[in-house]
Amino acid sequence: MRGKLAIILLIVFFANPLAAQELTGTLQQIKKSGQIRIGYRVSEPPMSFLDKDGNPTGYSIDLCKSIVTEVENKIGADVKVEYVPVTADGRFKALSDNKIDILCGSTTKTLSRSELVDFTQLTFVTGASLMTLKDNNDHDSGGLDGKKIGVVKATTTAVELKKLIRETSIDAEVVLFNSAKESIDALRKKKIDAFSSDQIVLIGIAVKAHDPMSFEISDGVFSFEPFALAVRRNDADFRLVADRVISDLYRSKKIL
């Protein structure tokens, strides 16, 4: 009799919603609102960009779509996905101000940024490089004296580019832009001589261009850029969901 009573009590306990783990932080907010907001950069191929129909797409966007599926499983409900475009200099504030729930793009994980946001496991590794027009082959550091080099402001590439110029005593001018698109437009119009960004992004830009053979990309890199997705600080449960998805994808070899 006592054994039967114990079994009944266990069934009641585990059937009680209060016995289940309570949702907290971002997961709780997503279930309550019924939506998840994905922050992304609009011109950072192949990580995040707009397709021909104006829809967000890319490697990081695909990762975040997989995370959304796992979030739905975790909270036991379907959610609406809202894509929120962000800039390089406004992306972390968008997270801290609760305007987005996760940052999916080409964001480098650094210690200083970890004071502002939390990062997932690494999603990609690249390095900063240089792009020029093919009729201008001064893309090696030795040929940049007197040149103008464009870079997106509030990026690690901007920091590393200025460091490179300082340490090698190159007489080059750094020109800051709000986006990769603005930088490429300036390069095409020859307002700058080169554009510096993460090498994988430079390759993505060239591949997507209507005239990919017009660009020259330096073989070398001058920085180490480990990419990761970003979430709000001290939200371990939500970050764990994202980390689990990323880990499972790598183990499954769906991404290499």
Question: Where do the protein language model's features map onto the residues?
Answer:
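Bacterial N-terminal signal peptides
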Residues: 6-16
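Ligand-binding clefts/hinges and TM-proximal coupling segments of bilobed small-molecule sensing domains
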Residues: 20-24, 31, 156-175, 213-217, ...
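Extended ligand-binding regions for polar small-molecule ligands
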Residues: 21, 62-70, 137-138, 142-143, ...
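Extracytoplasmic small-molecule ligand-binding "clamshell" domains
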Residues: 21-104
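Bilobed "Venus flytrap"/periplasmic-binding protein-like clamshell domains
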Residues: 37-46, 56-72, 108, 126-180, ...
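Periplasmic-binding protein-like
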Residues: 42, 124-133, 199, 206-247
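Acidic, polar ligand-binding/catalytic clefts
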Residues: 65, 69, 76-143, 213-221
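A ligand-binding cleft/hinge motif common to bilobed small-molecule-binding domains
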Residues: 90-93, 104-116, 160-167, 188-223
